[in-house]
Design a protein with these regions (language model features):
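Bacterial N-terminal signal peptides that target proteins for export
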Residues: 2-13
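Short, glycine-rich nucleotide/cofactor-binding loops
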Residues: 55-67
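Acidic/histidine-rich, surface-exposed loop or edge segments in extracytoplasmic proteins
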Residues: 44-58, 89-93
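Histidine-anchored nucleotide/phosphate-binding helix
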Residues: 64-79
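Acidic helix-start/capping segments at beta-turn-to-alpha-helix junctions
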Residues: 84-98, 127
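A cross-taxonomic marker for long C-terminal extensions/tails that follow the last structured domain
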Residues: 99-168
């Protein structure tokens, strides 16, 4: 085998090895894909109307306004014989809406949840972890709360799925 051809084979082999190494390194550094939001948190994806309501303040009046908005929307579309799916997404100080120890509206949430299967209450796991750390004890949530990794990301996901966005 002539030396020139042997050099060419060596160079091609080295180039292929380098290429495979780069692909393997890039794959190893690619962060794992985040799991999509839990299916349990989806209210009714087939609902004709879909609404996301944001609560990010620890204010009883804002929490009640969010619940009023939800109930008014439910009543409006029920009167028209149409379905609506509503997710109330809490994060930051708004997580108090779903905290078992500090929610000023937990009885109302329980009542509304029992009456409306297409109404979901979403709690931000990031906020829950931060509040637990700051308080030095686990933050427990009411039973109606469904925990998602990030409240803000959940709002983004809902908007990309065609949910109308409301911030009372």
């Amino acid at each position: 085998m002539p030396m020139r051809r042997l050099n060419r084979i060596v160079w091609v082999g080295a180039a292929l090895a380098a290429g495979f190494s780069l692909v393997a390194a890039a794959h190893a550094q690619t962060p794992p894909k985040q799991a999509p939001a839990k299916k349990a948190a989806q209210t009714n994806p087939a609902a004709k109307h879909k609404v996301a309501i944001q609560v990010n303040t620890n204010d009883k009046a804002v929490m009640n306004l969010a619940l009023n908005n939800a109930q008014n929307i439910i009543d409006f579309y029920k009167g028209k014989g149409e379905t609506v799916a509503i997710e109330i997404v809490t994060y930051g100080p708004g997580l108090h809406m779903l905290r078992d120890d500090s929610s000023p509206v937990k009885e109302r949430i329980t009542s509304m949840s029992l009456a409306n299967s297409n109404l979901a209450f979403i709690a931000c796991a990031n906020t829950q972890a931060n509040q637990s750390k700051a308080e030095g004890k686990p933050v427990t949530l009411i039973s109606e709360a469904k925990v998602m990794p990030s409240g803000v990301v959940r709002l983004m996901e809902l908007q990309s799925q065609g949910y109308a966005y409301i911030r009372p």
